[in-house]
């Protein structure tokens, strides 16, 4: 925690966090679209997207050379080119734990920062002989010749003026990210979004919902036990119990490009979705994006869903990114 934040009255920290929550709350009931170009960003804006996330044009090329996990943060030039073309908010992605990268994104005037778990995260290694934590770019367990567990660093988000979006595979991760200052939680990516299995997204949403139900139905003793298990404050668990949901917007992410899947995720309690770039592989991306917005707004209307299934050509998958 920075010296400035330690000296800051708690009311000011809370006021700044409330402002960030106001921004991310505006995304509820809408879609955020990942894009590879300004042209795709314009199409997303026209379809009603709440925001866009530019990602690297050379991402797939670099993965072919260096293998999975070689993703880089998006170049600021690509972000600026999207900002010049659209009026909706633009979200910048940074490596998990990379504070300076996040500061650079904030200076670039992005609306939000997505602390992404798959773009070469910064990790820490505990060296027992020296009683120190060593930070290094994503590396294998057992580095430095010691048997240890490597863990990912996370950015402490409260000092930032822009809101953060963070991924979570379960409720424990979601609550930790919120305690760090995240203003929107999405489901985590198990692999790159282009190859992520949509069933894993459904599984994570169900898992988080089941854990929330456990909190809602638990007594104070159970809450204290869960607070210790999750390593979060009891006050945060009480907020979840009172609201019967996460205290921040909750989005589904990972291989989302089929409107009928979006309808299912919304029916499960998601506040919105982050759409994969795979949507632009559809024969008519504009129609597909419009259908996703329809699925978000009318997920409980079977007549509307029948129409979007017909336009999508059934339930089956679209061609792969290389097809």
Language-model-derived ranges and their functions:
Residues 2-323:
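Alpha/beta enzyme core
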């Amino acid at each position: 925690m920075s010296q400035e934040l330690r000296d800051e009255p708690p009311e000011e920290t809370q006021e700044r966090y409330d402002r960030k929550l106001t921004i991310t709350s505006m995304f509820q009931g809408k879609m955020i679209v990942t894009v590879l170009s300004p042209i795709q960003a314009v199409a997303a804006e026209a379809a009603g997207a709440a925001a866009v996330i530019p990602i690297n044009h050379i991402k797939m090329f670099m993965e072919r050379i260096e293998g999975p996990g070689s993703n880089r943060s998006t170049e600021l030039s690509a972000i600026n080119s999207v900002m010049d073309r659209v009026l909706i908010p633009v979200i910048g992605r940074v490596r998990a734990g990379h504070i300076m990268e996040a500061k650079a994104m904030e200076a670039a005037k992005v609306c939000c920062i997505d602390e992404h778990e798959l773009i070469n995260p910064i990790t820490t290694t505990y060296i027992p002989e020296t009683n120190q934590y060593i930070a290094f770019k994503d590396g294998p367990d057992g580095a430095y010749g010691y048997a240890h567990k490597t863990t990912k660093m996370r950015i402490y988000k409260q000092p930032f003026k822009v809101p953060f979006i963070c991924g979570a595979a379960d409720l424990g991760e979601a609550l930790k990210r919120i305690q760090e200052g995240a203003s929107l939680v999405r489901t985590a990516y198990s692999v790159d979004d282009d190859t992520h299995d949509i069933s894993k997204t459904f599984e994570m949403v169900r898992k988080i919902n089941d854990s929330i139900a456990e909190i809602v139905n638990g007594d104070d003793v159970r809450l204290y036990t869960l607070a210790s298990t999750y390593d979060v404050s009891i006050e945060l668990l009480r907020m979840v119990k009172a609201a019967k949901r996460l205290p921040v917007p909750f989005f589904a992410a990972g291989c989302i490009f089929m409107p009928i899947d979006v309808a299912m995720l919304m029916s499960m309690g998601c506040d919105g979705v982050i759409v994969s770039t795979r949507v632009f592989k559809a024969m008519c991306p504009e129609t597909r994006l419009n259908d996703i917005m329809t699925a978000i707004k009318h997920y409980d209307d079977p007549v509307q869903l029948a129409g979007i299934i017909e336009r999508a050509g059934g339930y089956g998958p679209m061609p792969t990114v290389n097809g």
